[in-house]
Amino acid sequence: PNVKSQLPKPSQVWAEAQGFEAAPLTLLHIANSRGEIAEILVGAPRAGDDPFALGAIASKLPVGSYAFTAVPETPELVALGWCLELYKYDPLRPTKIKAVKLACPKGVNHAEVVVLAEASFGVRDRVNAPANLFGPDELEQAARNVAKAHGARFSVVKGAQLEKQFP
């Protein structure tokens, strides 16, 4: 739907003056009477675009809490994409994730999105880690931590035992 036509007249005038055409993943900040951001219009991705694409706006937004007024076509993927967009890797200077919070769209299992995002972050950390920071011992400890967190049994074959049992 044409969201601009549903906006209050001052917001419509502002959108027009800014030349906002709602191209995919473009943003338009609309201020309230005190000059504070009241809402942000976002150009939705086109049908068939990457289902995670809408999540890419998370890194373009100022710190704050956000919610979609219209439920996205794939709300689960948008919520996960939002989380994945905020990933940063820097083992020497741990960074805090930018506080751009999304209220989970209706019908989305928040806990599931968090588990998937955390799993992705863990894999990405290991892939991005230089070999001198993430060697066999660190890999073993990471695997041990995952096993422990999920109540799984864990064993390691190494050293002479590995030499003897390796195919």
Task: Set out the residue ranges of the language-model regions.
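N-terminal hydrophobic/helix-forming segments and targeting peptides
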Residues: 1-167
